Amino acid sequence: MLIFEHSRKNRRNYSQAPATRPAKNNIPDHLKRKSTPLLPEVSEMDTVRHYTRLSQKNFSIDTEFYPLGSCTMKYNPRACNSLAMLPQFLSRHPLAPEDTGQGFLACMYELQEILKDITGMAAVSLTSMAGAQGELIGITMIRAYHEAHGDTGRTEIIIPDAAHGTNPATAVMCGYKVIEIPTNRDGDVDMDALKAAVGPKTAGLMLTNPSTLGVFEKKVAEMSRIVHAAGGLLYYDGANLNAVLGKVKPGDMGFDVIHMNLHKTFSTPHGGGGPGAAPVGVAERLLPYLPVPIVAHEQGVYRWLTEEDRPQTIGRLSAHMGNAGVLLRAYIYVRLLGAEGMHRISEYATLNANYLMAELRKLGFEIAYPNRRASHEFIVTMKEIKDRTGVTAMNLAKRLLDKGFHAPTTYFPLLVPECLLIEPAETESKETLDRFVAAMKEILDEIATQPDMVKAAPHDMPLRKIDDVKAARELDLVWDPAG
């Protein structure tokens, strides 16, 4: 039921604006709307009940463990939200003169510098508003680099078969042909295939490290040498940066460009369709092409660098400089944790993943890459269980909902049949992981004794069986008062 369906004519609710200061309305009369906005007329009690019921129908990191692989569903500290919503930040207009926003510009400059240090890059731009847009920026800069050097014959981007789907989509959007290379049985990129794929047409290699298989590419330095020797550049998909914070820098691995998902590694809110942010870092060779604006600090004053300062820039990717509120939350997060805290993130994320992997292995679950240490996530394959009982990975995932846990990522990466990609972020306690293990044991016992019951799951959700295809293909997000 939508909030609009609770609406009744002339039903009222009190405005709950802050009472600490008088309300200001500086909107000129000629810009004020003349008609009444189409808003629901609902009492305070009905409003509270409506949104409380909705929250009870959804899983969230605020209520339970959320081991969604390759998504890093860590807790978002409330302090980050509170500080980012200070009136001084919220009332700042992006077109205000630079001298009136020195505090905000200082925060953005420091965030750029912190991300440079974390990644080992020469410079960072904060303008990108999503991970996929960060990829687009990175590959566009690689293209600009080759074109600036007259190397227009480079028409191919090499991508491992374990990559996120956005990688090949980005390469195609930038006009490149995708060359897919296989993964070997240990989970690493097949080096012979890489050597065979590189050549005068190679524009670059897109790589996630650790990969979506949950393992660190052991020969990443050699891969860098091979691609660079062929004249190509290396793109780092920062989806799994959480696993290596403070331990190794993408710049030290030889990468030329990186995007960082702030909603993963730097604890900004997930979901809801945004707002998002994915800062992009570059090595020296790509520095001229960074998108603008970028914050500079010169003679004690912060200012925007624009196209006039960076004539070779690929341009602007957002109306101003990205999603300011999200960037502020990330800045506050890294300042709260400090350097030591950033080191501990990767340590605890890796510890949690390996502990959970070991406990599930003891129960009899098959680990996809049993000879490798989990970097921050790992894969359980249920192929043998499905062949023996007919119970699929999706069945188990839906049964986990009945146990009070969000399901892991299912059927990704595509290389592993009947897979569950499980990522316990660093913020989860051992007690939480043990409860999850106990739930997995219960389901394993149910598969042995009541497989049909598991196949029919979930049983206790407000909505049980959803048409996944229709939900994805036929979105209906606009309320129509006429029905």
Curated annotation (Swiss-Prot):
Pfam families from the UniProt entry: Aminotran_5 (PF00266), GcvP2_C (PF21478)
Stretches for region Disordered: 1-33
Modified residues (N6-(pyridoxal phosphate)lysine): 264
Keyword field: Oxidoreductase, Pyridoxal phosphate
Enzyme Commission number, as recorded: 1.4.4.2
Keyword Cell inner membrane (UniProt): no
Gene3D superfamilies for the chain: 6.20.440.10, Aspartate Aminotransferase, domain 1 (3.90.1150.10), Type I PLP-dependent aspartate aminotransferase-like (Major domain) (3.40.640.10)
Cellular-component GO terms for this entry: cytosol; glycine cleavage complex
Presence of the UniProt keyword Oxidoreductase in the record: yes
Source organism superkingdom: Bacteria
Necessary cofactors: pyridoxal 5'-phosphate
InterPro entries assigned to the protein according to its UniProt record, in alphabetical order: Aminotrans_V_dom, GcvPB, GDC-P_C, GDC_P, PyrdxlP-dep_Trfase, PyrdxlP-dep_Trfase_major, PyrdxlP-dep_Trfase_small
A GO term, aspect molecular function: glycine binding
Record's catalysed reaction(s): N(6)-[(R)-lipoyl]-L-lysyl-[glycine-cleavage complex H protein] + glycine + H(+) = N(6)-[(R)-S(8)-aminomethyldihydrolipoyl]-L-lysyl-[glycine-cleavage complex H protein] + CO2
GO terms classed as biological process: glycine decarboxylation via glycine cleavage system
Task performed by this protein: The glycine cleavage system catalyzes the degradation of glycine. The P protein binds the alpha-amino group of glycine through its pyridoxal phosphate cofactor; CO(2) is released and the remaining methylamine moiety is then transferred to the lipoamide cofactor of the H protein.
Family per similarity comment: Belongs to the GcvP family. C-terminal subunit subfamily.
Quaternary structure (record): The glycine cleavage system is composed of four proteins: P, T, L and H. In this organism, the P 'protein' is a heterodimer of two subunits.
Protein name according to UniProt: Probable glycine dehydrogenase (decarboxylating) subunit 2
Organism listed in the record: Nitrosomonas europaea (strain ATCC 19718 / CIP 103999 / KCTC 2705 / NBRC 14298)
Encoding gene (name): gcvPB
